[in-house]
């Protein structure tokens, strides 16, 4: 591999590390918001557990769990790409 191509791939790797860091930060933020939503829901009075607010909170929490899982998968995928590119320039 010539120096120019190698340097370009190293630049791509650096960009991917930045993206992965942002994805991880988003993952943490979504997880924290989900914990807050769960705490909100379970601190509701029992007589509200069958109401619309509780149901909406459950749905939001479920959606955030799905988003969190997808963000984790994305982070793992980005790291795999980085590993392959690092092997290519090694």
Language model regions located:
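Long, low-complexity or tandemly repetitive, helically biased scaffold regions used
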Residues: 2-90
């Amino acid at each position: 591999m010539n120096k120019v191509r190698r340097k370009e791939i190293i630049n791509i790797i650096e960009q991917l590390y930045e993206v992965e860091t942002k994805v991880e930060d988003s993952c943490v933020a979504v997880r924290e918001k989900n914990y807050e939503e769960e705490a909100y829901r379970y601190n509701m009075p029992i007589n509200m557990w069958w109401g619309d607010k509780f149901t909406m909170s459950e749905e939001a929490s479920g959606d955030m769990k799905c988003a969190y899982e997808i963000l984790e998968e994305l982070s793992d995928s980005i790291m795999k790409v980085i590993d392959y590119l690092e092997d290519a320039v090694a």
